[in-house]
Swiss-Prot record:
Underlying gene: rps4
Keyword Glycoprotein: no
A cellular-component GO term for this protein: chloroplast
Name of this protein: Small ribosomal subunit protein uS4c
Species in which this protein is naturally found: Huperzia lucidula (Shining clubmoss)
GO BP field: ribosomal small subunit biogenesis; translation
């Protein structure tokens, strides 16, 4: 299954707020609200599927990409669910998003693909690059790169930077302080249900 490129608000209506996908809030029409069936029993499979979809769409991953991360998390020490979230949160595209250098993760991925971003003074054009503590994220020293990042800062200046990151916006410099912990991940998701969904596949 490829990465989703369709209407983002359609996904938000179905799954709820996903800041990595879009910052827009859909207006629910009365007829859409009336379609809900609160008395209908939802299967455990559907509940697990929905949590998996939240994680996939928030990070903008294809199904096989997410499955790959689940398999890596299973081989690591510690809680599989928390390791999975850490792997995704430490991706370069997500770090750029969390620093406010891009309004969404797809926007951050575009910055990386077009080589607007440096990691430790090296141009990195791989969105899945795994950031490490003490990594320094900067904007490439060219007018187009600086203009795009500055515009994004203005858009996202009200967003709170998580404590595993530090941002010096005037210099367009971000610092990775440590591996992210669960409390710093601003995403309403039950990662254990995601792991359970993949229990027979990973």
């Amino acid at each position: 299954m490829s990465r989703y490129r369709g209407p983002r608000l359609k996904i938000i209506r179905r799954l709820g707020e996903l800041p990595g996908l879009t910052r827009k809030t859909p207006k629910l029409k009365p007829d859409y609200i009336n379609k809900s069936t609160p008395n209908k029993k939802v299967s455990q499979y559907c509940i697990r599927l929905e949590e998996k979809q939240k994680l996939r769409f928030h990070h903008g991953l294809a199904e096989q990409q997410l499955l790959k991360y689940v398999r890596i998390a299973r081989r690591a020490k510690g809680s599989t669910g928390q390791v999975l979230l850490q792997l995704l949160e430490m991706r370069l595209d997500n770090i750029i998003f969390r620093l406010g250098m891009a309004p969404t993760i797809p926007g951050a991925r575009q910055l990386v693909n077009h080589k607007h971003i440096l990691v430790n003074n090296r141009a990195i054009n791989v969105p899945s690059y795994r950031c490490k503590p003490k990594d320094i994220i900067t904007t490439r020293d060219r007018p187009e790169s600086r203009a795009r990042i500055t515009k994004n800062y203005e858009f996202s200046q009200t967003y709170k930077i998580p404590n595993h990151l530090t941002l010096h916006s005037l210099q367009s410099v971000g610092l990775v302080n440590k591996i992210v912990d669960r409390e710093s991940i601003d995403l309403n998701i039950n990662e254990l249900l995601v792991v359970e969904y993949y229990s027979r596949k990973a």
